[in-house]
């Protein structure tokens, strides 16, 4: 069975639009890019369309790699800007941690600044990473997480690690296992899990024989195979489990949450 993520995304967007109307001013998101990567530029265009739909002002700043840190710092002091998004990939020679640390903490709507990530250790989710939060929102709609055995396959800073912390949070209380490329007996671990979240960047990585019947599977994968978008989960898994589709799954909820965070940032700054 496919999980209906579009309905979740629409619900988030409807609430976001209502909150925008109550603000009394137009919140603004600035996306900073130092890349000509076609998929990144396409995503930024989709951000613009979504912002217009929600009543949020939007601007794209194309800067040179050398200017990105100083640009992010300037946006931190610009009172007309409520949210800052920094587009990836970055040039290989540049320090990703330095760049992400320059995103203003109070405007870090994607939850990439190490300071915001660190708050997850204390169960504080002011601006959690959008993709990790999307996985949590979907799971909370599908099941009660307390005591559930959850396996997160992938240990990235943007998804795997923060998601594990969010699932462990008091009140959610999942029992979490994090697997990665060095994990032994991965199939045995996933097969004994109530929930499997896959974020490894390998098309159709999770096979039907790796999942128990009735499990929930969250597919965070974005892979292009012969020009078509494919997830990390093999389509056959849907025959025995509840699975988020790709496209139209986690990504839809992730984008909706990005703009929810813009409004949250605006509300906090107004105070």
UniProtKB/Swiss-Prot annotation:
This is Bifunctional protein FolD. Its EC number is 1.5.1.5, 3.5.4.9. PANTHER family: C-1-TETRAHYDROFOLATE SYNTHASE, CYTOPLASMIC, C-1-TETRAHYDROFOLATE SYNTHASE, CYTOPLASMIC-RELATED. Catalyzes the oxidation of 5,10-methylenetetrahydrofolate to 5,10-methenyltetrahydrofolate and then the hydrolysis of 5,10-methenyltetrahydrofolate to 10-formyltetrahydrofolate. The keyword Hydrolase applies. Transmembrane segments: none annotated. GO terms for molecular function: methenyltetrahydrofolate cyclohydrolase activity; methylenetetrahydrofolate dehydrogenase (NADP+) activity. It comes from the Bacteria. The gene is folD. One of its GO terms (biological process) is tetrahydrofolate interconversion. Keywords: Amino-acid biosynthesis, Histidine biosynthesis, Hydrolase, Methionine biosynthesis, Multifunctional enzyme, NADP, One-carbon metabolism, Oxidoreductase, Purine biosynthesis. Pathway: One-carbon metabolism; tetrahydrofolate interconversion. It catalyses: (6R)-5,10-methylene-5,6,7,8-tetrahydrofolate + NADP(+) = (6R)-5,10-methenyltetrahydrofolate + NADPH; (6R)-5,10-methenyltetrahydrofolate + H2O = (6R)-10-formyltetrahydrofolate + H(+). Belongs to the tetrahydrofolate dehydrogenase/cyclohydrolase family. Pfam families: THF_DHG_CYH (PF00763), THF_DHG_CYH_C (PF02882). NADP(+) binds at residues 154-156, 181, 222. GO terms for cellular component: cytosol.
């Amino acid at each position: 069975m496919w999980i209906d993520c579009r309905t979740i995304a629409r619900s988030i967007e409807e609430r976001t639009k209502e909150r925008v109307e109550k603000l009394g001013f137009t919140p603004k998101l600035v996306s900073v890019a130092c890349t000509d990567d076609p998929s990144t530029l396409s995503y930024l265009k989709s951000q613009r369309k979504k912002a217009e739909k929600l009543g949020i002002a939007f601007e794209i700043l194309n800067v040179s790699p050398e200017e990105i840190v100083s640009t992010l710092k300037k946006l931190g002091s610009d009172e007309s800007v409520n949210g800052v998004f920094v587009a990836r990939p970055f040039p290989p020679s540049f320090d990703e941690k330095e760049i992400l640390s320059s995103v203003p903490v109070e405007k870090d709507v994607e939850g990439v600044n190490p300071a915001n990530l660190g708050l997850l250790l204390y169960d504080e989710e002011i601006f959690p990473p959008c993709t990790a939060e999307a996985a949590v929102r979907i799971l909370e709609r599908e099941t009660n997480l307390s005591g559930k055995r959850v396996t997160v396959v992938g240990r990235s800073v943007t998804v795997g690690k923060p998601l594990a912390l969010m699932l462990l949070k008091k009140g959610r209380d999942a029992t979490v296992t994090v697997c990665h490329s060095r994990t032994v007996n991965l199939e045995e671990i996933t097969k004994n899990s109530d929930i499997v979240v896959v974020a490894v960047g390998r098309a159709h990585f999770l096979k039907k024989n790796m999942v128990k019947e009735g499990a929930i599977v969250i597919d965070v994968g974005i892979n292009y195979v012969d020009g078509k978008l494919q997830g990390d989960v093999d389509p056959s898994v849907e025959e025995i489990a509840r699975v988020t589709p790709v496209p139209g799954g986690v990504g839809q909820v992730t984008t909706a949450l990005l703009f929810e965070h813009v409004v949250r940032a605006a509300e906090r700054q107004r105070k």
